[in-house]
Amino acid sequence: MPTVEKDGQEFESSLERDLMSLLRFDTDVDTFVSQPVKIEYQGKEGVLCTYTPDIIIYHRKDIASARKKPTILGEVKYKDDLCQNFREYHPKFRAAMRYAKERGWIFKVFTDVHIRTPYLKNARFLLPYLNKSYEHCTIQSVIERIEELRETNPHELLASFYLDKWNQAMLLPVVWHLIARRSIGTNLQQPLTMSSRIWRMYYE
């Protein structure tokens, strides 16, 4: 049975839950919906069958980085399951590809290989900081300091403000917030630590 999360989105597996964490962290994503459509297709010997993809993902139209990204109709599968049962899934996926193409979307299968990476761990860590509010003057001070330093790491950035650990700890959530908001850049494909290289992000 599907499980309901706090925001009402449903998921049937922990892998779907992990994908939803990535989508919530993706600033190009507008909304996503679980089990969005039921697709009819002909199975063996012309028998009418139905298939319900796991998710549909809509991208934002108000920012340049997302404007040209297509809507994605998606299925979530473990790679081993996909390999072992591909013959069973193939007619369903073919129907979904056709359904998506007719609407100008794309159909995509997400596997654990693509989902469960260091990026996921970073996304899950940073998500609680994404929409938190901090004083504008504090945010501006951190941004201006990292612009001065050009490239640094969280440890060095905090040390440039305070020598004592208490004040550094008080400021650290602001750094995580700015990384989550992509105001500060870093390589999120690698584990995020206090020694990770960080820099100011600029957008056109």
Where are these regions (language model features)?
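Electrostatic, structured charged patches in enzyme active sites and in nucleic-acid/phosphate-binding
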Residues: 1-204
